[in-house]
Swiss-Prot record:
Transmembrane annotation, as ranges: 192-212, 227-247
Catalytic activity: a 1,2-diacyl-sn-glycero-3-phospho-(1D-myo-inositol-4,5-bisphosphate) + H2O = a 1,2-diacyl-sn-glycero-3-phospho-(1D-myo-inositol-5-phosphate) + phosphate
Stated role: Catalyzes the hydrolysis of phosphatidylinositol-4,5-bisphosphate (PtdIns-4,5-P2) to phosphatidylinositol-4-phosphate (PtdIns-4-P). Does not hydrolyze phosphatidylinositol 3,4,5-trisphosphate, phosphatidylinositol 3,4-bisphosphate, inositol 3,5-bisphosphate, inositol 3,4-bisphosphate, phosphatidylinositol 5-monophosphate, phosphatidylinositol 4-monophosphate and phosphatidylinositol 3-monophosphate. Negatively regulates the phagocytosis of large particles by reducing phagosomal phosphatidylinositol 4,5-bisphosphate accumulation during cup formation.
EC number: 3.1.3.78
Gene encoding the protein: PIP4P2
Membrane topology: Multi-pass membrane protein
PANTHER family according to UniProt: PHOSPHATIDYLINOSITOL-4,5-BISPHOSPHATE 4-PHOSPHATASE, TYPE 2 PHOSPHATIDYLINOSITOL 4,5-BISPHOSPHATE 4-PHOSPHATASE
Composition bias type Basic and acidic residues, residue spans: 1-10
GO biological process, one term: negative regulation of phagocytosis
Subcellular location: Late endosome membrane; Lysosome membrane; Cytoplasmic vesicle, Phagosome membrane; Cell membrane
Name under which the protein is recorded: Type 2 phosphatidylinositol 4,5-bisphosphate 4-phosphatase
């Protein structure tokens, strides 16, 4: 798990070693305080118990974790709460971040934002400026800053992502499914109506040219080009109207602006 290729959004302990206990996230409560998403600190101090076996307190439930044969690992799993506790400094260029749901994450030390991968959490943790920490001490989480933007529920996959635009009626690309949707329904509705209006006007103009210039077109065949242009523009506008009418809409969940 210390390799550089580890997905930064995934929990540090895989599901294959989760045992019989499944960690659950507490219900999400919107807190106006910046400490609502402050990851709890930890101290990677290994102390032997009375029998000489190295142990450490779990940073979530404070239970003792046996470190016998695990000192080569960066994190260990608590058998009581099933959460991860770090016992070593993170790899170079990385840092630990603990989500308020107690999921321990690893990310680049320059990261400003990280998302929790647990399906029942899906929080987006905003980290403050990077702080330099000596290698002798475990990395401490940076203070989260108040984000600007909107939590948006994707109209395709239903996942929540942070949209940094401070206005609605824009197109957004979901980072989960990579599909484009409209943030709010006003933009596609307005553009659909506009394209329908322009398309019908072009078709009516084409019909008028066809009826009014039939005799003229028999002598000057270039008149047929104007008919084709009018009908083609009308068809293109109607196709665009169908696109905007069928586009998926993503709705904002909470606004931080």
């Amino acid at each position: 798990m210390a390799a550089d290729g580890v997905d930064e959004r995934s929990p540090l302990l895989s599901a294959s070693h989760s045992g019989s206990v499944t960690p659950t996230a507490p219900p999400y409560l919107q807190d106006s305080s910046p400490r609502a998403e402050l990851p709890p600190p930890y101290t990677a101090i290994v102390s032997p118990d009375a029998s000489g076996i190295p142990v450490i307190n779990c940073r979530v439930c404070q239970s003792l974790i046996n470190l016998d044969g695990k000192l080569h690992q960066h994190v260990v799993k608590c058998t009581v709460c099933n959460e991860a506790t770090p016992i070593k400094n993170p790899p170079a260029g990385k840092k630990y971040v603990r989500c308020p749901c107690n999921c321990l994450l690893i990310c680049k030390d320059t990261s400003r934002r990280i998302g929790c991968p647990r399906p029942n959490c899906r929080r987006i943790i905003n980290l403050g400026p990077v702080m330099l920490v000596s290698e002798e001490q475990p990395a401490q989480p940076a203070l989260p800053v108040q984000p600007e933007g909107t939590r948006v529920v994707c109209g395709h996959c239903g996942n929540t992502f942070l949209w940094m635009e401070l206005r609605f009626n824009t197109l957004a690309k979901c980072p989960h499914c990579k599909k484009i949707s409209s943030v709010g329904s006003a933009l596609p509705r307005r553009r659909c109506c506009a394209y329908i209006t322009i398309g019908m006007m072009c078709i009516f103009i084409g019909i008028g040219l066809t009826v009014g210039t039939q005799d003229f077109a028999r002598r000057f065949h270039a008149t047929y080009v104007s008919w084709a242009i009018a009908y083609l523009l009308g068809l293109v506008c109607l196709i665009r109207a169908c696109y905007w009418g069928a586009i998926r809409v993503s709705y904002p969940e909470h606004s931080f602006a």
